[in-house]
Every structure is written in structure tokens, then in C-alpha cells.
Regions:
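C-terminal helix-to-coil terminal segments
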Residues: 7-8, 15-16, 87, 92-107, ...
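Phosphate-coordination loops involved in phosphoryl transfer and adenosine-cofactor binding
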Residues: 67, 140-143, 209, 218
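Glycine-rich NAD(P)-binding loop of Rossmann-like domains
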Residues: 121-155, 177-181
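N-terminal glycine-/charge-rich "phosphate-binding" loop or analogous flexible N-terminal tail
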Residues: 1-48
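Short acidic/histidine-rich motifs immediately flanking catalytic phosphotransfer sites
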Residues: 41-48, 65-67, 188-193, 216-219
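Hydrophobic Val/Ile/Leu positions in short beta-strands of Rossmann-like dinucleotide-binding domains
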Residues: 5-6, 72, 144-146
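Rossmann-like adenosine-cofactor binding region
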Residues: 55-60, 172-262
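Phosphate/diphosphate ligand-binding glycine-rich loop within oxidoreductases
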Residues: 47-123, 137
Length: 299
């Protein structure tokens, strides 16, 4: 079976070179940018495609009759392709879980601290010649509410507890070591709310206008999961009114975020470029697992 890594970017190329082994299955690597409409030409003749967050529209994949497997480098394949439609066409989508739990959790905590102390704004102002110290929020003893206690959420809870925060969580099933609360209680009590849910039809728009209104006034929101978990218009309104003090966001409804987007212009928002999972350690584990999936398929 022929395999291709269709979008190996400049960051991943050196990592790929480190993890690939002589006895691994042959996988062609494309490092050149491509337009979406070029996808059928790029995938022509391949049975397996490794995809690092490139969009895979069903109508374009349908023009690739040999393609039977897509190995998505991460968990959120549904944000980049219609998994059910592809399955109906005989294309199986494989995802990779657990590789970046610690990386994403650490980034979540970093955004929380940056938001609490307004670090990004002070950095911008100091570089521009403005010296205006900002009064921040001390996190010791504050309540961290973790919504979604999968691998990442549990890591966020563990680190939050380690820096002296009181941690409560909301999850559909019980998780050892994290006190649970009903959602309304969590939203009302939490000084910081961390979104760590998987995006699906049930969780899309989970943090709605009504639920944002139930948040503790002046709370911080951190989202390193998926942008579509949060009602964007309601979030912007809450940031403008001050009901949400600050948001630390790594994910957005549309990526990349355009510079004229309202969130990009707000002083009380700290932004990163969907990079929470991007550490050398996580990337090495991710690529190694992807290669192992190709090996299993090709047997």
C-alpha cells in the first residue's frame, strides 16, 4: 500500500527525520504548500494519507478512488473533514489520542497565568515604549473549574492543584481525584473556567449565551480544546462588558484567525495559534504513533 504524509510543515519535517526508522513502512513526504483544489492530484495513487490539520472536503476525497485511510495527526478530525461521509465512501479516518495531554495542559495553565497577570498586553506596551504596570489576579486559593475530564482535563486539574488552586470539574462520568460539581455550580464558583471537551454534535456551542451569563462575574476563560465549543458572539459580548475579565484562547471558529476579527482587537484577550499541542516531545510521540498506524494498516 502506498502512503503519503501530505502536509509535513517546516516544524514537523525535522521531527519526522528524527523519528523515522529504517524498518518503517515507506511513506512519501510532501513539504510543499498546496491549494485545497490540488488535493486530488497530490493524493493520486495513494492508499493512506497522513494529515496534519489540512482540510479534506468529501467532494475532493471522492476524486481519490485509491485512498482508503486517513491518519489524522491529532484527535479533532471532525473539524477538518466529515468523518461519517468519508466512512460511507469507504475511507476510514484514524485519530491519535493521548500524545499531547501534558503539552496541552501546560499551555492551558500558561494561558491562565498570562490572562490573570495580563502578560501579553504588558509585553506589547513595553515594546511600544509604554510603561504601565497592570494589576493582576493572584491564583493561589482561587477556584479552577475544568469542563471535560479526559486526559487533558485531568492534567489541567493536576497542575492547577499543584499551584495551590481549588479544583472542581464537570464531566459526564466520574474521574478519580477531581471533585465534581454540576455545571451551574461550577460556572458560578470558578474564578477560571477551562474548556477541555471533545467537539461533537452534543458539545458544539456548549458554552452558550445562557451559560456564559451564569459564570462568576470577572472570571477568566481558557479554551485550548475547540473554538466551536463556545458561542463566539456571546464570548465577545461578555469580554466587552467585563463579565469575563480575560480570555486565553488557542482555538477559534475559523482558523487562522484574521487580524480584523473582533477577538484580535480586544485588549483583554490573549491569543495563541492553535499551538497548545506543539512541543517536541508531543510531536515525536504523535508522529511515531502515526507511523505505527500505517504499519498496522499495511500488514
Amino acid at each position: 500500500m502506498k502512503s503519503i504524509f501530505l502536509d509535513c510543515n517546516d516544524q514537523l519535517a525535522p521531527v519526522w527525520a528524527r523519528v523515522i526508522r529504517p524498518d518503517d513502512p515507506k511513506i512519501d513526504v510532501n513539504t510543499e504548500p498546496f491549494a485545497r483544489e490540488e488535493l486530488p492530484l497530490l493524493l493520486a495513487g495513494y492508499d493512506i494519507a497522513l494529515d496534519d490539520h489540512s482540510y479534506m472536503p468529501t467532494e475532493l476525497v471522492a476524486q481519490c478512488p485509491e485512498l482508503k485511510h486517513i491518519v489524522f495527526l491529532g484527535t479533532g478530525a471532525a473539524s477538518y473533514m466529515n468523518v461519517d461521509e468519508l466512512k460511507a465512501r469507504g475511507v476510514t479516518v484514524h485519530t491519535i489520542k493521548g500524545y499531547g495531554d501534558t503539552a496541552v495542559a501546560e499551555h492551558t495553565i500558561a494561558l491562565m497565568i498570562a490572562a490573570a497577570r495580563d502578560i501579553a498586553r504588558m509585553d506589547r506596551e513595553v515594546r511600544a515604549g509604554t510603561w504601565t504596570p497592570q494589576e493582576g489576579v493572584q491564583l493561589l486559593g482561587k477556584t479552577l473549574g475544568v469542563i471535560g475530564l479526559g486526559g487533558i482535563g485531568c492534567e489541567v486539574a493536576r497542575i492547577g492543584k499543584g499551584i495551590g488552586m481549588e479544583v472542581i470539574g464537570w464531566n459526564r462520568t466520574r474521574r478519580a481525584g477531581v471533585p465534581l460539581a454540576d455545571l451551574d455550580t461550577l460556572l458560578a464558583r470558578a474564578d477560571v473556567v477551562s474548556m477541555n471537551l471533545t467537539l461533537n454534535d452534543e458539545t458544539r456551542g456548549f458554552l452558550s449565551t445562557e451559560r456564559i451569563a451564569r459564570m462568576k462575574p470577572g472570571a477568566i476563560l481558557v479554551n485550548t480544546a475547540r473554538g466551536a465549543l463556545v458561542d463566539e458572539a456571546a464570548l465577545i459580548a461578555a469580554l466587552q462588558s467585563g463579565h469575563i475579565r480575560h480570555a486565553g484562547l488557542d482555538v477559534f471558529h475559523t482558523e487562522p484567525l484574521k487580524p480584523d476579527h473582533p477577538l484580535a482587537k480586544m485588549r483583554n484577550v490573549t491569543l495563541t495559534s492553535h499551538a497548545a499541542f506543539r512541543t517536541l516531545e508531543a510531536s515525536m510521540m504523535l508522529l511515531r504513533r502515526a507511523i505505527d498506524i500505517v504499519r498496522t494498516i499495511a500488514r
